[in-house]
Curated annotation (Swiss-Prot):
Annotated source species: Streptomyces avermitilis (strain ATCC 31267 / DSM 46492 / JCM 5070 / NBRC 14893 / NCIMB 12804 / NRRL 8165 / MA-4680)
Taxonomic superkingdom: Bacteria
Protein name, UniProt field: SsrA-binding protein
Compositionally biased region (Basic and acidic residues): 148-165
Gene field: smpB
Chain spans, region Disordered: 1-23, 148-177
Family stated for the protein in its record: Belongs to the SmpB family.
Compartments it resides in: Cytoplasm
Keywords, sorted A to Z: Cytoplasm, RNA-binding
GO CC aspect terms: cytosol
PANTHER family: SSRA-BINDING PROTEIN, TMRNA-BINDING COMPONENT OF TRANS-TRANSLATION TAGGING COMPLEX
SUPFAM superfamilies per record: Small protein B (SmpB)
GO terms of biological process kind: trans-translation
Main localisation: cytoplasm
Annotated function: Required for rescue of stalled ribosomes mediated by trans-translation. Binds to transfer-messenger RNA (tmRNA), required for stable association of tmRNA with ribosomes. tmRNA and SmpB together mimic tRNA shape, replacing the anticodon stem-loop with SmpB. tmRNA is encoded by the ssrA gene; the 2 termini fold to resemble tRNA(Ala) and it encodes a 'tag peptide', a short internal open reading frame. During trans-translation Ala-aminoacylated tmRNA acts like a tRNA, entering the A-site of stalled ribosomes, displacing the stalled mRNA.
């Protein structure tokens, strides 16, 4: 019996064991950026990578902690993202922290360029993932948080967690557990 390709189950995404979020296989996330910056707007950008970079990403090896995005001329570039060398690579291996071109539409680049020139605004990478077999980067226009903003965010998160625990405990008590 013929089964159309869309309804066939997807094959596994490799041995990396990283989280799959719908059709996205997330390779790396920048949790520090979400803590240090207030996210204003997010964009999805394609990445121009070499073969060994793709293979290293498929193994689930990357770090965006020190990464940032810079608009140079009419092109967006991802700087300081760490993609380690591919273990089976030879002399064709890539440079670990080279700048990588981001693929965005012209109007998105223009909007990011104008907004990032405003004081306090920057462009940070949030995640690297594969979507339909293509490497993508989620980038965000962000504004830096002050120290008291970070403390307030942590306090709100802790309060939310405590209230969720209290609600769960009340429900358990009500059920008689």
């Amino acid at each position: 019996m013929y089964v159309p390709k869309e309804s066939q189950p997807k094959q596994g995404g490799g041995a990396s064991g990283k989280v799959k979020d719908g059709k996205r296989k997330i390779v790396a996330q920048n949790k520090k950026a979400r803590h240090d910056y207030a996210i204003i707007d997010t964009y999805e950008a394609g990445l121009v990578l070499t073969g060994t970079e793709v293979k290293s990403l498929r193994q689930g090896r990357a770090s965006l902690t020190d990464g940032f995005v810079q608009i140079d001329g009419n092109e967006a570039w991802l700087h300081n993202a760490h993609i380690p060398e591919y273990s089976q690579g030879t002399w064709t291996n890539h440079t670990v922290r080279r700048k990588r071109k981001l693929l965005l539409h012209r109007e998105e680049i223009d909007k990011l360029a104008s907004k990032s020139e405003e004081t306090g605004h920057t462009i940070v990478p949030l995640a690297l993932y594969f979507k339909d077999g293509r490497a993508k980067a989620e980038i965000a226009l962000a504004r830096g948080k002050k120290e008291y903003d970070k403390r307030q965010t942590l306090r709100e998160k802790q309060d939310r967690r405590e209230s969720d625990r209290a609600i769960a405990a009340a429900k358990r008590k009500q059920r008689g557990e």
